[in-house]
Amino acid sequence: MKDYLVKQVSEDGQLRAYAVNATQVVTEAQEKHDTWPTSSAAFGRTIVGTLLLSAAGLKGDTKMTVKVDGDGPVGKIVVDGNAQGTVKGYVTNPHVNLPSNEKNKIDVKAGVGTTGTLSVTKDLGLKEPFTGQVPLVSGELGEDFTYYLAKSEQTPSAVGVSVFVNEDSTIGVAGGFMIQILPGADDRLIDVLEARLQEMPLVSELLQQGMTPEGIITEIVGELPMKTLEELPVKYECDCSKERFAKALSSIAPQDLKQLIEEDHGAEATCRFCGKQYQFSEADLKAILAEQ
């Protein structure tokens, strides 16, 4: 099944719903960063959460950066997303593989940690980007995204993010959902949704059964009539370039650039988001120095 995200709204205007299959996106992230199972699950869940938040909160050329910074061995997770369904990211410690938890699942909570922060920075094209930050409440990440939306954006929501890692450390499936209650919604509807969410299987189990993002939303909302607003392809794509790294080098102090020229006779830059390497010759560095 292809990767895509669907946005829906109930016909009575009481709720918005988003669901995504991001299996190929998370697979590409896993392969680019050589992540081990615990890191893969934590990184993948953050990617899925970023896709959902970006779909709900961005338009046009706007962007966002999600940072999960817990006290677990995985370290910091950073994911950039945009309104077009494109993400890129990195994890500080990709090689974490902890023992399974008591449910015999990957122990994401132990990997991420339970003390730390989840922050979302939106670049909406204004003078200053907007950042909302909340403490981690779970470390499982779905609950942490839900808490962020309630506290930082005052939007009552339910977020589920799920990654299944195969025995050989490849990604089996990855996806998630986000349900947002709109102003004026009936309390009875909220009660019904909460009950259905309690009984619902994991998103990864539904995806393994071949369920589509639309099917995942139906699993949650039941017979409530919904209409689709948009179907958005999603992908992992890095926009790094040699020009961008040259710009970064041009911000280095002149004496440090001279040191690179005289001692190293060049420089190598590696993109944290995709691992691509860029070589700068002595002549390249001299040209950058001359433009300072």
Curated annotation (Swiss-Prot):
Domain of life: Bacteria
SUPFAM superfamilies for the chain: Hsp33 domain (SSF64397), HSP33 redox switch-like (SSF118352)
Principal cellular location given in the protein's record: cytoplasm
Parts forming coiled coils: none
Keyword flag Cytoplasm: yes
NCBIfam families for this protein: PRK00114.1
Originating gene: hslO
Example GO BP: protein refolding
Taxonomy of the source species: Bacteria, Bacillati, Bacillota, Bacilli, Lactobacillales
Protein name per Swiss-Prot or TrEMBL: 33 kDa chaperonin
Record-linked HAMAP family: HslO
Organism: Latilactobacillus sakei subsp. sakei (strain 23K)
CDD domains: Hsp33 (cd00498)
Family the UniProt entry places it in: Belongs to the HSP33 family.
